[in-house]
Amino acid sequence: MASLGNSGSASSPMVMLAPKTKTKKRHFMQQKVKVFRASDPMLSVFMWGVNHSINDLNQVPVPVMLLPDDFKANTKIKVNNHLFNKENLPSHFEFKEYCPQVFRNLRERFGIEDLDYQASLARSAPMKGDGQGEGLLFTSYDRTLIVKQISSEEVADMHNILSEYHQHIVKCHGSTLLPQFLGMYRITVESEDTYLIVMRNMFSHRLLVHRKYDLKGSLVDREASDKEKVKELPTFKDMDFRNNMQKVYVTEEQKEKMMEKLNRDVEFLVKLKIMDYSLLLGIHDVARGEREEEEAEEPCYEDDADPENGLAPALQVGSYGTSPEGIAGYMNSIKPLGPGEFDPYIDVYAVKSAPGAPQREVYFMGLIDVLTQYDTKKKAAHAAKTVKHGAGAEISTVHPEQYAKRFREFISNIFA
């Protein structure tokens, strides 16, 4: 079994103090997970590995400070056991966790307790998700976390920015529109590697998103295809936003707060020469959500999950049920939320529409696809698009500084 101790020496320079102890939210005892059953063996190993990792981390004291070596560390577990029940886990697999102490620290700064993280990911198999950036996505069964499949190159990119990302999160006290990165893993089943990164869900675990935009601030080749538009929840783009005459109706104070966060985060991305990111905008129509909820049976998590694959049933109604365990678990202990209401400690990317808006809406806004650095591929793409569209066209592949300027200008104009 892998050791979870720090690999840094006592003489290494200090990087950042761990956060001070905060008042913990009400917490519930959670049943130990014994079966890690999913339709995909990779997901079964992922659930097993997260459960094992958190159990091990709980035996290790939280370090007073993070050391430089913590940003390079990893733990690896290799299992060769033919006695495993193959219905639950493959007989040979590897589970590797990157920078466990760093992500543990980030989870704390984002207000996520390890036991809740463990329950959200390991109690029941993640479900196939959709719509928060590129790549294969899964959503935790309680819909609070996104598990995204990434490439080995993106793992390297994440390592390259992790120290600066951590410092940025410390400086802004966790108040950011950037993805909240919570863990990064490699799963090996039958000699095939799968890389996964876990993030907080930018959309609500409870309120259904009715319209969705991916905005880059460019109008060239930025319109949803006909194939995309017929989907149940299409991802619309910049041209669609303009053609639909869409606006975000928030108060002036909310707009200022949003733009302050956005400017701070974009400056951070420019410093790291990162570009091609988007603003993900999800819109919940409160009246429509209320109607859908009335038309449907009362949504809740029952024990009618598919016994073969352990997947929780996907509820397509105005608002989702809440899970008894995990990050959203304590919601059940407080007063029920009304239409369009949310807990800002869970739905951290959410903001209500302003009084007097044409209709009551809830907006979810965050930055996605933030691992693209300006390199030779981007330079080549920029040259090709310049030839095709002309030097003055608003193409998406430009230099990081130009990209940021255009992006901020566009986003500042999405508000009513």
Curated annotation (Swiss-Prot):
Residues 38-415 form the PIPK domain. One of its GO terms (cellular component) is endoplasmic reticulum. SMART domains: PIPKc (SM00330). Keywords: ATP-binding, Cytoplasm, Endoplasmic reticulum, Kinase, Lipid metabolism, Nucleotide-binding, Transferase. GO terms for molecular function: 1-phosphatidylinositol-4-phosphate 5-kinase activity; 1-phosphatidylinositol-5-phosphate 4-kinase activity; ATP binding. It is found in: Endoplasmic reticulum; Cytoplasm. It holds the Pfam family PIP5K. This is Phosphatidylinositol 5-phosphate 4-kinase type-2 gamma. It comes from Danio rerio (Zebrafish).
